[in-house]
Amino acid sequence: MTDIKSLNYDELVTYMAGLGEKKFRAGQLYQWMHEKLADSFDECTNLSNALRQKLKETSEYVCLEPVRVQHSKLDGTEKYLFRLSDGNYVESVLMKYHHGNSVCISSQVGCRMGCRFCASTLNGKVRDLRPSEMLDQIYRIQKITGERVSNVVVMGSGEPMDNYDNLIKFIELLNDERGLNISQRNITVSSCGIVPKLKELADLKLQITLAISLHAPNDELRKTMMPIANKYSIEEIMDVCRYYIECTGRRISFEYSLVKGVNDSMECAKQLIELVKGMNCHINLIPVNPIKERDYKQTGKEEVYAFKNKLEKNGINVTIRREMGRDIDGACGQLRNKYMEDIDESDGGY
């Protein structure tokens, strides 16, 4: 079965021609899928019943099923848990800002990177998400809320560079003027630092924002937090980041989760300053989300601001990430893990 929502426009034209259909039919279907956000072929009312039946028999129409929604009473953040067609689950977050709505999506079911501060790695990677499954997280949220999504962050469960080909196809579809037409500059992709794939991404010269999950200013400390550091050194990561900036002209963002007593010292701040000085970059400080299965604790507010001030005084562009959805299991993987626990406790019932 063809995953029809993962086809770009030209591929869909070819596919429809194989069914004996003219090009304009492909345009109609593409509009239903990516602009009108139809839930199924049945909603494509300007396609004949015979064509809709033919499509049902030859292709799969991905439409994620929301099984749990949490609403933050603190800031209006909404967290969605979606069931996939194979029974797996992924989660997404809608964050509301004055400049528009931003959706954080997952790129994989689970994750194999093993970062110690992240809940999505607790049970490892199950599988990659297809372009359609990444897109439909955004489509479902926009359709459920009736509010336009203006920004997309690929920073949920999974490592996007570990699902590279599907990620690039997803960006192409999301950016297509025939669909949601979300500007590349409004798309942020996070990575823990798979260097060869980051180089490939740089060579594409896309105008997306790249966010590197750094979290430590030296290899020794980073290895205790992120297993990927055993494969790629910070020096290699910084080199590919400079290459990315050179190729794209885009500023790099470095994510730095502050963990109490681990990476929040003034010495760490000094090392971080030396690491990024002179780069066209931005540091995003993140008070780590406490996870019951991990022993990491959040740095105190006073220490967070001391760390920030140290960077600012040395000319580093830095912000503290606003904590969103703190009362609704807002960190990556927490809602999925809790839901799976609930299913286990109820012996498989929903």
UniProtKB/Swiss-Prot annotation:
[4Fe-4S] cluster binds at residues 111, 115, 118. Pfam families: Radical_SAM, RlmN_N. GO terms for molecular function: 4 iron, 4 sulfur cluster binding; metal ion binding; rRNA (adenine(2503)-C2-)-methyltransferase activity; rRNA binding; tRNA (adenine(37)-C2)-methyltransferase activity; tRNA binding. Its EC number is 2.1.1.192. It comes from the Bacteria. PANTHER family: 23S RRNA METHYLTRANSFERASE, RADICAL SAM CORE DOMAIN-CONTAINING PROTEIN. This is Probable dual-specificity RNA methyltransferase RlmN. The gene is rlmN.
